Amino acid sequence: MARSYDTLWRLIYGGNIMLREERNLETIPVGSLGIIPLEGCKALGNKVNDYLVKWREESKNEHKSTIAFSGYQRDTYIVDAKVPRFGSGEAKGIINESVRGDDLYLLVDVGNYSLTYSLCGQVNHMSPDDHYQDLKRIIAAVGGKARRITVIMPFLYESRQHKRSGRESLDCALALQELTSMGVENIITFDAHDPRVQNAIPLKGFETVQPIYQFIKSLLNNIDDLVIDSDHMMIISPDEGGMGRAVYFANVLGLDMGMFYKRRDYTRVVDGRNPIVAHEFLGSSVEGKDVVIIDDMISSGESMFDVAKELKRRKAKRVFI
């Protein structure tokens, strides 16, 4: 049987046994790299591109000359793309070069309010909804021709609406499902409000990069007299939402932890929420200690200021947010 298979192989290939180059799965790229930073993320996109150009020029790789590495080393990896708007305020995505077979990375900052557009004679600031729609327009312009699409979204769109309370929409889950249905394979974000939202797309890639290491490194590099032990420092969660992160910080650094809980007046609604009556503290004394406040998200910042003031009233030494 083995001889017959060998004979068949020789007949098909005219007696020439073709030597196959073994695929190096650790280094071989999925496709030619392409970066599309949307308008609100141009600065970050340019920095990423400059780093990659320099790194690939300096890196040594024995496989660079193979056909699989075609387009590996280039002057730029940024794809020429734009999202112009019509006079009606509507827009369209345009890609001015081929992305067929490319490994595309789309960068979008949905929280960039500095961008504006004109509509009916009025200047409008771009909202997260506008940025998200532009992202979908670029994905639609790709037309399914890319080998793989990865979306890098530093602030996860609709991450505040990650769970349902009553008759509410699950916007974050819907957005993730919509992106993956359009062909997105991976979504990369930073410190998602609730990483469990990835349950909406269990068969696709979802990475939430935690900033804990960078935060601790920044503290140590900039505060010379910082002493990290339970006698000199304490981790504080301003509410129940930041508990998970605060517990992790405290365990990593070997520190005690305290928390505040928001006492609300549920008989009234002000600006769409129940007003906070007081911040009640649970934990040991903070007197004379440096305290680090760890929260999951800052919106207006009012609660963070109130917590910091209360900690100083309790004679905390320094407050780091």
Task: Describe each model-derived feature in a short phrase.
Residues 1-321:
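PRPP-associated nucleotide enzymes
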